[in-house]
Amino acid sequence: MAIAARTVHEGDGRMAPGSVRDDQETRVVEGSLETTGAAIEARGRRALPVAMDLLDRPSIDAMVDRVLGEWGRIDALVNNAIYQGAGRMDRVLELDLDAATKLVVGNYVNQLHLIQLVVPGMLERGGGRVVNMASATATMDPPAPAGEGGWGLGYGASKAAFLRVAGQLHVEFASQGIVAFNVDPGFTTNDKPSDEEFAKRFRGAPPEVTGAAIAWLCSSDDAIELAGTLVYSQPLCKRRDLLPGWPPHV
């Protein structure tokens, strides 16, 4: 919600917010399609809330068709959705291979499908921006086993695959105006992790920090120098002073 709302503050508001499905446990996640749409419209912009299932490719096709039918173009694609189903916190010998396959499909294969649907239109218009949400689970080993302050193999492996996409887009299409980034939000304080040891190890920032960073990446010419790289949203937000009042002065 914070990413969509902040991006609409900077741009023209043509965002389709997503949702997170968690098949392994019931969690309360702040925000919804309705509240995100309301936050956008409160800023005087239009919103088009569309439900989409990362495991259901036809629903992805339908979402893109609806957005293009309503507005005719997509200038920026922010892949912020994640699939957090069964197996994401399983250890190596406990990970069911069918669950691992779903994680890879939801967090890599079908998000690649979405990119393949959207980027050709960007190329026809001379360019566009793609922001892929990364994760520390894709770039580092856990500090401890899952359930003891670390994370499982399945989720990290699926995010590691997706991490390769932005750099590949940059290599293949930067000369044609495609500006692609990976963004690592760091630990975000509204994540409410069930693993208390994990929460103790990582201090977080509010989601508005990553929202401000992504809005800047999608709109600023200065951001082009970061294309093809992994951008850490919290240091970027602090360095560029993108969110007034953050970090708070002690």
Which positions does each model-derived feature cover?
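Catalytic loop of short-chain dehydrogenase/reductase
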Residues: 83-85, 94-98, 129-175, 187
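Active-site loop of short-chain dehydrogenase/reductase
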Residues: 45-46, 73-74, 122-136, 175-179, ...
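A short, exposed helix-loop element centered on a Lys and neighboring polar residues
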Residues: 115-116, 167
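Short beta-loop-alpha junction of Rossmann-like oxidoreductase domains
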Residues: 87, 141-142, 178, 182-197
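C-terminal helical subdomain
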Residues: 175, 182, 199-250
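Short-chain dehydrogenase/reductase
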Residues: 1-71, 85-91, 95, 249
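Conserved Rossmann-fold SDR core element
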Residues: 73-75, 163-169, 173-188, 224-231
